[in-house]
Amino acid sequence: MQKLAELYRGKAKTVYTTEDPDLLVLEFRNDTSAGDGARIEQFDRKGMVNNKFNHFIMSKLEEAGIPTQMVSLLSDNEVLVKKLEMVPVECVVRNRAAGSLVKRLGIEEGIELNPPLFDLFLKNDAMHDPMVNESYCKTFGWVNEENLARMKELSYKANDVLSKLFGDAGLILVDFKLEFGLFKGEVVLGDEFSPDGSRLWDKETLNKMDKDRFRQSLGGLIEAYEEVAHRIGVKLD
């Protein structure tokens, strides 16, 4: 499938149209950002690692009955996906306290959250992705109640599948972000799942194996991503 015009350029991915109006090409770049794009650096192999990582995870979720936009892997850094009507709200599932939750509530990083928390954030970089709730979604018409309930259901189902996948590989799935859209009226998982949008810690050492290595200037970003990929069985080369 040939990519045509650039449709959208995000912080780490570029979306292209194709000759099929229902399909898009998603290109993973080497860019890495923090602070809503205020800080951007490039890392060799990152686009390839995240593309193959994402394809692997989406395939696992499809196998578990979670509909995704994934169609096929095109190249090291490109994937063919369904064109979704994206919901402007992202879902976050939290198994342990980290990131904005720690800052917001003043709680200790790493404490277990049982049951896991489900948060909603409006996708708006200029406003720093403000936290919202189901009432906001209804009032502002971002997503209807039925589809939001389905998004929540699929988010928790993904958490069950992925917590086991990473757990079996000696990793803790601390939290993660999911974005959904509609394809022919059906709620479908879109965007990506990679260490860019999740927190993954080593079970024994609690070493951070995700984008916090970049956010917190810990170093070894790509090495950590590749280690996680290797542990769960992603074929990178």
From Swiss-Prot:
Pathway: Purine metabolism; IMP biosynthesis via de novo pathway; 5-amino-1-(5-phospho-D-ribosyl)imidazole-4-carboxamide from 5-amino-1-(5-phospho-D-ribosyl)imidazole-4-carboxylate: step 1/2. SUPFAM superfamilies: SAICAR synthase-like. One of its GO terms (biological process) is 'de novo' IMP biosynthetic process. The keyword Ligase applies. GO terms for cellular component: cytosol. It catalyses: 5-amino-1-(5-phospho-D-ribosyl)imidazole-4-carboxylate + L-aspartate + ATP = (2S)-2-[5-amino-1-(5-phospho-beta-D-ribosyl)imidazole-4-carboxamido]succinate + ADP + phosphate + 2 H(+). Disulfide bonds: none annotated. Its EC number is 6.3.2.6. Keywords: ATP-binding, Ligase, Nucleotide-binding, Purine biosynthesis. Coiled coil: none annotated. Belongs to the SAICAR synthetase family. PANTHER family: MULTIFUNCTIONAL PROTEIN ADE2, SI:DKEY-6E2.2. This is Phosphoribosylaminoimidazole-succinocarboxamide synthase. It comes from Pectobacterium carotovorum subsp. carotovorum (strain PC1).
